Amino acid sequence: MEWGPGKTAQGRARLPSSRPREKPQLSCNLCGDAAHQPRVTTQDRIRHLESLVFDLMQQSSVTQGQHGGGTPFSPVGSARFPVNTAVATTGTDSGSMRSTGGGANYVVSSHWAAVLDGIAELKDHLDSEDEAVHSDVHGVESPTAEITGPQLLYGCPKPASKDEILASILSLSRPVVDRLVSRYFNSFEMSPAVLHSVEFLKEYEEFWDDPSSVSPLWLGLLFTIMCLATQFEKFRLDPGVQSPAALSMERDLQKMADAYKLRIGQCLVLGNYTKGGPYVLETLMLYIAAEVFSSTDAEIDIWILTGNTVQIALHMGYHRDPKHFKGMSSFAAEMRRRVWATLIEMDLGLSAQMGLPRMIKQWQTDTQEPSNLQDSDFDKATVEMPPSRPETELTPILYRLVKARLMTTVGYIWDFAADVRPYTYTEVERMDSKLDEARKSIPDCLKWHSFARCITDSPQIIMQKVVLETLVYRAKIILHRKFMLGPPENSADSKRIVLESALKLLDYQHMLQEESQPFCQLYQERWRVSSLVNHDFLLATSILCYYLQNTKREGMPVSESTPMDETIMVSLRRSYDIWLQSSDSSKEARKVVKALNVVLGVSNTSGTDSGLDSSMSSSVPSGCASSTINDYQSGVEIPAGLGSQFPVLDGAMMPNWATFADDLLAAPMATPSNEWQAMDAAETVDTMGSLAWPWNLQCHALAEKVNDESLD
């Protein structure tokens, strides 16, 4: 059957409506049955309409590119490339909009949710579920609905005086708070970018000498440290131990963290934080980090709070380099540079997670990058800053410095993705070259080689290396996705780069799953994974699903599938089990499981197994790292080894799943495989036994007290 402009659904030429009928029709003869006319389904009509819209958008975009449409300003260099005027355009260039029970959700076209929306075969599943969910909640407002996300956005439930806040801290013994502060500085890799450890400890001693002398905002900063440290302890609990003592411990730690977050909001309000001032940005940034750790999925509230933080930073002049301001100390200037670099990273990461344009543009700021210095190299008494240490020396701040440098290029790429104007393949080549240069500039002490070469590294360093690598792969996908199915002269390279990058990201996901198992190298650091991290893997999964479904739509017989297609199928099958294990606690994981059910043809009728048929299961090796990607020569310099990713606020750059239905399809969901759970069940060791909690009763009492106050 041939469809197209001027054709009927059966492929015949359409007669003009003005054609006169030569004689009246006085009778009709019964026609015989059409010879095996194919049935035109609703799905066929959807595809036909999509193809027409796609053709029209291509024509419109090319016209704009030729007549003043222009391409986005690219301030990342002037390398000479042969001019290629092919314009990046796909059927989802305008992004994706979905109505929800509470309004509408929009994401840019490079967001994983928009990618899945572009798969016609998923439309019926996703849309029908949307309608079912929304019809249940339409016009119904729960009187007992809890506020989720940062309470600071909605006002504190009960304002508190400084004396009340002080009393809640002083009710704890100092050793209790000391342990929490120690846990924070020894666990959180973002701490040197926000707080100067030497100066903070001086202020900490002054607080215990005279508690009433500190400001409410400094108290808020202390509570953010205590909150994050408590979350870190909770995340370290063994999920395989479900004894009453373990469950009680988890509940107590969650109550403590919630109590501390309530106090943070009270301190910020009491300190009139919107006016700015000392400790405001540091407290807000750590508060945002605590909220990110509390959420299993992307939350719009956190992004909005980040926007407020950016506005306060602009109001305080952080976007301008301190050299413009006379009288500012060397110490203050260096710390402002550290805070601003970290805020840029948070803005980009959370904006990309939500699938929305970032708030800080590079052309709006001239703040220089911070120096590679230990905290012991300078303090408030420093008059002239020492020279930056060489980047062969791995200081606590070096990772943030290197990542901020890489994020400059990644930020421009995200601006491309969020720009409403089309861009040319020449711009893609230029940006891709800049990205490769930025990757090559990563110091060797933070450069990923292979997991085997990381056996002497700390888990934190391993994850830092992998994060920098995955940042590049994410950016490659975002940059080349629009040309993936574009003009033949450009699509081959872009398709290869996108597929190899997506496969590599899923290899990292698989390694993450393996190395975070008991007795493996990253087991004690598995808590570092956040909702931001999973968006890298969501994008990789959705882009591979999109590719496979488009291959099917092109009519390629199964017997003609390429080795790359087989590699993709194996990788997606392994990821399916990982997503399935997370689906109980994550709506985003449930959504991608539904998509994979359709793409992989997974039976969803059984509630006793993972849903993979025997042929699929047999093709996935159990308990070993995926090596299929290494069988291919990569155009993006894929390293030989694999690794896993557990960044803290390191998901910078990948889109969100927020536009899908909360629950996809009414069919019962398959349960995860028993292998991982059985291994945990066989282990009877209570890992909490080695954790002495002499301070638990005091912290629990504080949590109960604060919760009672909030209900008064």
From Swiss-Prot:
Transcription regulation listed as a keyword: yes
MF terms in GO: DNA binding; zinc ion binding
Chain intervals for the UniProt region annotation (Fungal transcription factor): 302-379
Alphabetized CDD domains for the sequence: fungal_TF_MHR
Transcription regulation in keyword set: yes
GO biological process, one term: DNA-templated transcription
Residue numbers spanned by region Disordered: 1-26
Keywords for the protein's UniProt record, in alphabetical order: Activator, DNA-binding, Metal-binding, Nucleus, Transcription, Transcription regulation, Zinc
Localization per Swiss-Prot or TrEMBL: Nucleus
Induction annotation: Expression is induced by the final product trichosetin and not by the trichosetin cluster-specific transcription acticator TF22.
Any Pfam family hit: Fungal_trans
One GO term describing the cellular component: nucleus
Disruption phenotype: Resulted in the down-regulation of the three biosynthetic genes from the trisetin cluster and a reduced accumulation of trichosetin, and blocks the expression of the cluster-specific MFS transporter MFS-T.
Function, as annotated: Transcription factor that regulates the expression of the gene cluster that mediates the biosynthesis of trichosetin, a trans-fused decalin-containing tetramic acid with antimicrobial activity. Plays a specific role in the induction of the cluster-specific MFS transporter MFS-T and thus regulates the detoxification of the toxic trichosetin in Gibberella fujikuroi cells.
Full protein name: Trichosetin biosynthesis cluster transcription factor TF23
